[in-house]
Amino acid sequence: MWTRIKTAVASRWPGAKANLRALPRRLATLFWESFWLGVKLMTIGFLVGMGFWLALGFLCGLAHAADVTIPRAAQQYRATLVRAAHATWGLDAPVAVFAAQVHTESWWRNDTVSHVGAQGLAQFMPATARWLPSVAPETGKPAPFNPGWSLRALCVYDKWLWDRVAGHSDFERMAFTLSAYNGGLGWVNRDRKKARTLGVDDRRWFGAVENVNAGRSKAAFRENRNYPRLILKERQYAYIKAGWGPGIKDEVRL
């Protein structure tokens, strides 16, 4: 068929024979040029889209920071928390996360006692306060109403939990850590185990394990799920903005 077309065209327009001979090669070149142009445009679109979502996440964090008021009482404990965080986590410690955690636990009121008996700035239950020195001797004798002990114990206990959980990113890993601080490491492990049986990614907290309940009461489940979200997605940004130290960035999953 192609041969007959070439013969007919060549007999009618003799000068077109060479052009016809080169036509398949030109079509192939045009195809690949179009293909790579499409790839380049898709890549540019992806990068622009990723930048948009990262910028959106950052701006949302700033918006949340504007909604959060740091209690005046926090200032007197700022230096103590920074020292405790650096001693346990190093100089790049996510101080803003720990500050937001204390904010969430007690609103920086050292004399706070919850309805279930949790005590002090970091709201340690008496049993947990007694147990902690057995796995972290550096915390010393339990003293939940002593601000120095309480803030040091919070940083140490967070690190102990952090070393026993996993996540796809530091942001996800800290969410698991905070859930364990609030409700116990055993519950986190049970939630992750159930997530695996449901085909849910057990190394991802937000939008994954946070939706899985291995048996907690509705009230306990709701409180536990709000805890990492309030700290990581809202309150830490107020402390970052106020210059307390670094936090942990929300990595956008595309």
Indicate residue ranges for each PLM-predicted region.
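Extracytoplasmic
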Residues: 93-97, 103, 116-119, 174
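N-terminal intrinsically disordered, acidic low-complexity segments at the extreme N-terminus
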Residues: 2-21
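Extracellular/periplasmic catalytic domains that process cell-envelope and extracellular macromolecules
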Residues: 90-94, 221-224
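Short, charged helix-capping/linker segments at alpha-helix termini
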Residues: 85-93, 166-169
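Non-catalytic cell-wall polysaccharide-engagement segments
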Residues: 9, 14, 25, 33, ...
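Peri-catalytic and regulatory segments of divalent metal-dependent proteins
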Residues: 77-89, 112-113
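Cell-wall polysaccharide-cleaving catalytic domain and substrate-binding groove, primarily
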Residues: 103-128, 132-134, 184, 231
